[in-house]
Structures are given as structure tokens and as C-alpha cells.
């Protein structure tokens, strides 16, 4: 199927009323390729956006008793490196399909000794160390200043922590993710400096993905699966490699999938316990 949402571009910076009844989904997941294989009644949907093509087709199916849209942020063949992902197109596609909650799992490195590989961190803050990424939908003519003080939905974070604990996973209930530009990994000096600031994890995709989702008044939660200690943490830690990240992530993928399914099962239909749906109420001049 194919949807043309280019004609809807003029809603910015106005309120939107985009509804796609036939293929609507309640929850969206940005993640690695392959997760859609666990869907019931999976269907591939093409979405054209005002910002160009998303990373891939969107997979829509049933998971945890709810309609879920899944988009592999790097593409199904991992062809889009983190600094080249069309984040605006990806987020727009989810909004266009009626998604109101975004779950954003990712692989991440640990910057602190107590955050061990194999554990999960439900981040509550980010630090943006990227450069040149387009990170807003609001380029005028109406000035719109969306707060990033609390970048992740408090209600979804609580539900994610509970879901992980119910699955027997070691969960860190909060943490700061420092987002680097990529595709290179950090130098030891950079990694050591990040850790000295007290930041817990390091990743390449959480910004601007999460903030753009918030700009469109969607709830967003990050679940970081820790794959390695970053290079500046221990003197005897070998520099991180992509192969190592993939190996550890794959070993823990079953835990992540079980946790996400349980999280989805417990997400309520109504958004009554957060302010995410009213993000723009105080953002405009």
C-alpha cells in the first residue's frame, strides 16, 4: 500500500488532523531489523513524507494485543548509518499512521562501572553531542520552542521499568544517554570525559529521534540495551567494535523482545498521566 502525505506538509506549524484509518497503529517502535517477524498479521506499508523517504517501509501488525507499527531506523539491510538517518521522515511516518506512543530501543555502551553489559537502562535524559542533524519540524514562520527538560514520557518509563523487572531483567530506572555523531566510536579521551560528567550510556541515534517525536506530541520512551563498556571506562577495556556490539545485542535480543511485548500489553489506551499530548500548548510565541 502507498500513502502520499506531501499535501499535508502545510500543517506546519499548525495543528494536524491526519488520520489513516485502514492502517492506523497505536504504538510505534524504532529499532533494529527483524523485530517485525514477531508480529501477528504483519503488513508492509509505504509512506511518502514531506521530508523524503523514511528508512524503510513500515511494518504494521498485532503485538501484545495492540496495533503496532515498526520501522527499522537503519533500514532492513542496515544501509543508513546513524548520521544519515532521515529522522524527520521516520517520525512523520509514525505520526501519519496515527501513532501516539513511540518505543525507541537501542544498543548502547556503558560509561559507568555499575551499568554492566546485558543490563537495560530506561533513560530519562539525553546530552546531544551530534552535529549537523536536522532536529526540528518548526523552521517558521511561527516560532516554536519545545522544551527538552523532560525528554522522555514519565508514564512510559515507569511501565518500561516494571515490564523489564517482571521479565527478570536487570533494569536501571533512569540514566543519561550522551548521543554522539557517529559513525565512528569515541576516542578514549572523549569516553573518559563523558563518564566523568556522570552520564551513564552512549549511543548514536537517540537524538534527534526522541525529540522530534516529542515535537509531534507523541509519548516516547527509550530502552537502552547495554552491549559493552565504552573505551574510556577501564584501562584494560579493548576499544569497542561493531562486531562486539552486534554479538552482545543478538544474545540479549530475546530478553528485549519479551520486555517490549510486556510493556506494550500494559500501555493504556488513554494518555491521562502525562503532558506529552499537550507539548505545544506553551511552546509557541
What are these regions (language model features)?
Residues 2-4, 8-149:
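Metabolite-binding pocket within alpha/beta catalytic cores that recognizes anionic/polar moieties
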Residues 91, 191, 207-210:
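Generic hydrophobic/aromatic pocket-lining and core-packing "Φ" positions
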Residues 95-98, 195, 214:
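Non-catalytic positions within long, well-ordered alpha-helices that form the structural scaffold/packing
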Residues 100-101, 200, 219:
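Short acidic/polar active-site loop segments enriched in Thr and Asp
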Residues 151-196:
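Active-site rim beta-loop-alpha module in soluble metabolic enzymes
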Residues 204-242:
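Zn-dependent metallopeptidase/amidohydrolase metal-coordination segment
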Residues 231-283:
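His/Asp/Glu-rich mid-to-C-terminal helical/loop segments that flank catalytic regions of hydrolases
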Amino acid at each position: 500500500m502507498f500513502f502520499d502525505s506531501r499535501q499535508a506538509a502545510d500543517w506546519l506549524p499548525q495543528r494536524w488532523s491526519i488520520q489513516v484509518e485502514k492502517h492506523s497503529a497505536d504504538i510505534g517502535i524504532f529499532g533494529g531489523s527483524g523485530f517485525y517477524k514477531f508480529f501477528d498479521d504483519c503488513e508492509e506499508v509505504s509512506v511518502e513524507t514531506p521530508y523524503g523517504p523514511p528508512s524503510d517501509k513500515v511494518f504494521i501488525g498485532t503485538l501484545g494485543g495492540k496495533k503496532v507499527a515498526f520501522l527499522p531506523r537503519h533500514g532492513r539491510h542496515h544501509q543508513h548509518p546513524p548520521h544519515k538517518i532521515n529522522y524527520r521522515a521516520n517520525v512523520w511516518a509514525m505520526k501519519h499512521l496515527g501513532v501516539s506512543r513511540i518505543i525507541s530501543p537501542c544498543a548502547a555502551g556503558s560509561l559507568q562501572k555499575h551499568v554492566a553489559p546485558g543490563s537495560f537502562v530506561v533513560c530519562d535524559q539525553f546530552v546531544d553531542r551530534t552535529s549537523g542533524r536536522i532536529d526540528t519540524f518548526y523552521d517558521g514562520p511561527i516560532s516554536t520552542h519545545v522544551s527538552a527538560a523532560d525528554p522522555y514520557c514519565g508514564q512510559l518509563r515507569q511501565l518500561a521499568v516494571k515490564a523489564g523487572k517482571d521479565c527478570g531483567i536487570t533494569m536501571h530506572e533512569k540514566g543519561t544517554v550522551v548521543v554522539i555523531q557517529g559513525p565512528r566510536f569515541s576516542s578514549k579521551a572523549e569516553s573518559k570525559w563523558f563518564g566523568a560528567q556522570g552520564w551513564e550510556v552512549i549511543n548514536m541515534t537517540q537524538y534527534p529521534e526522541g525529540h522530534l517525536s516529542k515535537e509531534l506530541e507523541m509519548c516516547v520512551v527509550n530502552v537502552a540495551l547495554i552491549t559493552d563498556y565504552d573505551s574510556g571506562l577501564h584501562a584494560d577495556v579493548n576499544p569497542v567494535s561493531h562486531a562486539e556490539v552486534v554479538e552482545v545485542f543478538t544474545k540479549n535480543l530475546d530478553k528485549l523482545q519479551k520486555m517490549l511485548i510486556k510493556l506494550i500489553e500494559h500501555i493504556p489506551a488513554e494518555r491521562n498521566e502525562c503532558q506529552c499530548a499537550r507539548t505545544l500548548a506553551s511552546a509557541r510565541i
